[in-house]
Amino acid sequence: MDRPGETTHFGFRDVPLGDKQTLVNDVFHSVASRYDLMNDLMSGGLHRVWKDIMINALDPPRGDRPFALLDVAGGTGDISFRAAKAAGPGFHATVCDINSDMLAVGRERAAKRHLETQVDFVEGNAEALAFADRSFDAYTIAFGIRNVPQIDLALREAYRVLRPGSRFLCLEFSTVEMPGLDKLYDLFSFKVIPPLGRMITGDAESYQYLVESIRKFPKPNAFADMIRDAGFARVNWQTLSGGIVALHSGWRL
């Protein structure tokens, strides 16, 4: 639900709250076809390590026991494919993303991996999920929640669709905490990533937004408080690679 008159940030710009989703959609329509390649180039391949750590924390069952994962903002399927590889035959993932171009990439990748029966793709909004209460055994969101206009609504929706005893996991860029690395990281982010985006995708502005959006995202302790406010218990986090990213966890008890 929009909040008339309110503003939010789109990168370093202040925009009307109701406009942010359209602006974010335009970013991902523009970069969808080269999104995963850019992730490799921007992170030096480290995003693969971070995602594997997330899947290890998820620890999906390896037997026949049914296990339903909701992967939000997971359009290209990377998290769900990794989870399916780690899980047993009872595993099923639903990828929910608001961007149709990202979902198209994910569906194509699922077909190439012969995962159509284990992973399906649904266009939807993290702030208003079209799923019944207590439908899923886990909820993951990787590098997506900072793009949601109303993060508090998305967190409440995550809580709503999880069954009691289920886990919320969020992997997101964070605040670099290692002295010296912070300056190098800022230099790389603002001087290298947008030109790299122009070279690979033809779009520097989208990557300018992405690096700015990281700086506007709450610090790990503040984001943990938001997760608790949504109803989750046993909330904790770990920072990775000197604080470049953080993995937050919470449980619906």
Swiss-Prot record:
Q: Name one GO biological process term.
A: menaquinone biosynthetic process
Which key words are in the record? Menaquinone biosynthesis, Methyltransferase, S-adenosyl-L-methionine, Transferase, Ubiquinone biosynthesis
Q: What class of enzyme is it?
A: transferase
What Gene3D superfamilies does this protein's entry cite? Vaccinia Virus protein VP39
Pathway involvement? Quinol/quinone metabolism; menaquinone biosynthesis; menaquinol from 1,4-dihydroxy-2-naphthoate: step 2/2; Cofactor biosynthesis; ubiquinone biosynthesis
Residues reported in the UniProt entry to bind S-adenosyl-L-methionine: T76, D97, N125, A126
Reactions that this protein is recorded to catalyse: a 2-demethylmenaquinol + S-adenosyl-L-methionine = a menaquinol + S-adenosyl-L-homocysteine + H(+); a 2-methoxy-6-(all-trans-polyprenyl)benzene-1,4-diol + S-adenosyl-L-methionine = a 5-methoxy-2-methyl-3-(all-trans-polyprenyl)benzene-1,4-diol + S-adenosyl-L-homocysteine + H(+)
According to its UniProt entry, the function of this protein is described as: Methyltransferase required for the conversion of demethylmenaquinol (DMKH2) to menaquinol (MKH2) and the conversion of 2-polyprenyl-6-methoxy-1,4-benzoquinol (DDMQH2) to 2-polyprenyl-3-methyl-6-methoxy-1,4-benzoquinol (DMQH2).
NCBIfam families documented for this protein: MenG_MenH_UbiE (TIGR01934), PRK00216.1-3 (NF001242)
Protein family (similarity comment): Belongs to the class I-like SAM-binding methyltransferase superfamily. MenG/UbiE family.
In Swiss-Prot or TrEMBL terms, this protein is called: Ubiquinone/menaquinone biosynthesis C-methyltransferase UbiE
